[in-house]
Amino acid sequence: MAASEDELLLPRLPELFETSKKLLEDVEVATEPTGSRTIQDKVSKGLELLEKAAGMLSQLDLFSRNEDLEEIASTDLKYLMVPALQGALTMKQVNPSKRLDHLQRAREHFVHFLTQCHCYHVAEFQLPQTKTNSAENNTASSSMAYPNLVAMASQRQAKIERYKQKKEVEHRLSALKSAVESGQADDERVREYHLLHLRRWIAVSLEELESIDQEIKILKEKDSPREETACHSSLPEKPPMKPFILTRNKAQAKVFGTGYPSLATMTVSDWYEQHQKYGVLPDRGIAKPASADFQRAAQQQEDQEQKDEESEEKALHRMREWDDWKDTHPRGYGNRQNMG
């Protein structure tokens, strides 16, 4: 009875796979926006068919980790791509409120596909890190002061190699496609065709996982500023910092004072040259008598300073008198012309 049920399920599995694969190709080459109703209907239909196909594969138990790649039939190799197709269609879903869920679900599908291919040794590649390992690596990398330039260079080189391999695989696929789809290819060509498809999807899955991890990190950190603001607001306010005075400015204020009159009017060299010019410098402790020119210049300077002081006092006196007059005579005082 179980064998008859399997026979009824087997013919439907290729149909489900090919239909869902065709829907994914239509979505990828469509010119309409991804968020349009037509595209989203195709995405939902493809995911529904792939879910049924995955259930059938689980019931039929086509793949086992105890067997080698050579033990899998050539016609069954393509069903290893079911998780990769699920991940690709999940990435096409458009719903901003559920974007994080879609990314995590797509990541699970891609990791499942890569794990299967790694177990069967379909190609040489490094499995992506799990959530636990990635969390530990993020903690370790955050504690480092500088990024690991060697790791970044190796990642860049790995991307370049994957890109070259992907282009080579696509070129070989285009050469085998017509013969395989028309049924004219032998078993060896069919097997090579499906293996090339698997290797192409391995490269695509690795690229998608990198972009998924980056987008998940951005979405999770989007709400972190709010949490940090809440944490900062709960902390007690610190007292304001005391003003500080530079030692240099403090010492300079002691010498020159804080206002303009305290500043020096001439340097020591200027003073020395001025006194040397008029011959009033001391000679061996005995001061020379001041010359008539120097005495006359000194007297003129004193007279000028006295005149300046007197003029300043007069100007100040006039300003004070004017202020007193304005206090006792309000504006408009004495204007008797416009009285009613």
Curated annotation (Swiss-Prot):
Residues 47-61 form the UIM domain. GO terms for biological process: B cell activation; negative regulation of apoptotic signaling pathway; positive regulation of dephosphorylation; positive regulation of transcription by RNA polymerase II. It comes from the Eukaryota. The modification N6-acetyllysine is found at residue 242. Residues 302-312 have a biased composition (Acidic residues). Residues 226-291 are annotated as: Interaction with MID1. Expressed in spleen, thymus, liver and brain. Ubiquitously expressed in B lineage cell lines. Residues 223-242, 291-340 are annotated as: Disordered. Residues 313-330 have a biased composition (Basic and acidic residues). GO terms for cellular component: cytoplasm; microtubule. It is found in: Cytoplasm. Residues 99-203 are annotated as: Interaction with PPP2CA. One of its GO terms (molecular function) is protein phosphatase 2A binding. Phosphorylated. Monoubiquitination by MID1 triggers calpain-mediated cleavage and switches IGBP1 activity from protective to destructive. Residues 292-301 have a biased composition (Low complexity). Keywords: Acetylation, B-cell activation, Chaperone, Cytoplasm, Phosphoprotein, Ubl conjugation. The record marks 256-257 as: Cleavage. Belongs to the IGBP1/TAP42 family. Associated to surface IgM-receptor; may be involved in signal transduction. Involved in regulation of the catalytic activity of the phosphatases PP2A, PP4 and PP6 by protecting their partially folded catalytic subunits from degradative polyubiquitination until they associate with regulatory subunits. The UIM domain is required for protective effect on PP2A. Interacts with PPP2CB, and with PP4 and PP6. Interacts with MID2. Interacts with ubiquitin. Interacts with partially folded PPP2CA, but not with the fully active protein. Interacts with MID1. PANTHER family: IMMUNOGLOBULIN-BINDING PROTEIN 1. This is Immunoglobulin-binding protein 1. It comes from Mus musculus. The lineage of its organism: Eukaryota, Metazoa, Chordata, Craniata, Vertebrata.
